[in-house]
């Protein structure tokens, strides 16, 4: 768009159709069929869209997402685990309600209920937390318990968790104080010995002790630049009273402690193994009691800070097939998209999907092992495919998954190839 008035130079000058600035006043001018838009207007549009996305987060009539709404979104990405989803949905819903109730002076103070997720590896604990992060309108951060140590030792301080939450809230202290923290691999900070006085356990019991206060509620002094490297910086004061903590861990071996308690067996090899085979890890974990967690290595005070306990189930063959095919970000859909980019259709037969699920069960890696299995099956095909001509479909059957056959390449007919 040019403006007709002015000197000869101005006739050739282009202007933004929205704000009217010339090409010399802005960094870039993007041309459409009959209009132009400058980089500043594009940025403004993006800001407007971002704000609209924030305000369009799931809300019920009183501004609090209902447990059903939260659970429905979790269902889009996480297969199974109905019991754990319901517990998480109610806990997050109540967290929102506590925040909206905070200013009311009716004498009733609502305390938070932190959550402990217990389940076998690859059953969806971390994915549940990541999916929650997508749908919540409060700051959310994930931390790895294995990197934490007591203050004064090499490693991360527990205050770094609050710092990460503060960063996810763009250093808005008030928003960070209403956030949710997920601490993964919490079972890795169990006490290393039944006798706490033998030696100082800086990455086990020491971390549990350090987490107690921030989980219950304290004013944490958080260094904005990350702590030990900048000792002279000013500290930000963050009140953790209203921060919801969700902890998750596989707790490998906990099922044996539960089984031994249930059968009153101090040694009894056969009985415990038989119980495990008949019921599976997930079924056994459902009977977990605080005393079992204490025997595993969590201190009683730490267990007391996690009043809500949710156990996750083992993923069976049917659930693993659903994980491969059904969610919005299903693994099979991802690989099919990669093959689409080469104009090739990728097809897994129903028998092949069953074989993939069985391999994952044999490996005992749960859903986490599915990607490595798929990668090993399709590696050679993905290597060769860009150099092949006329291939329109690749078919994977059970024999291919088991390593007894090569993938089937379906070529376009001669007439189609010539037409192409």
Curated annotation (Swiss-Prot):
Zn(2+) binds at residues 16, 19, 38, 41. The keyword Chaperone applies. It holds the Pfam family AAA_2. GO terms for molecular function: ATP binding; ATP hydrolysis activity; ATP-dependent protein folding chaperone; protein dimerization activity; unfolded protein binding; zinc ion binding. The keyword Flavoprotein does not apply. CDD domains: RecA-like_ClpX. GO terms for biological process: cell division; proteolysis involved in protein catabolic process. GO terms for cellular component: HslUV protease complex. Residues 4-57 form the ClpX-type ZB domain. Keywords: ATP-binding, Chaperone, Metal-binding, Nucleotide-binding, Zinc. ATP binds at residues 120-127. NCBIfam families: clpX (TIGR00382), PRK05342.1 (NF003745). Belongs to the ClpX chaperone family. ATP-dependent specificity component of the Clp protease. It directs the protease to specific substrates. Can perform chaperone functions in the absence of ClpP. Component of the ClpX-ClpP complex. Forms a hexameric ring that, in the presence of ATP, binds to fourteen ClpP subunits assembled into a disk-like structure with a central cavity, resembling the structure of eukaryotic proteasomes. This is ATP-dependent Clp protease ATP-binding subunit ClpX.
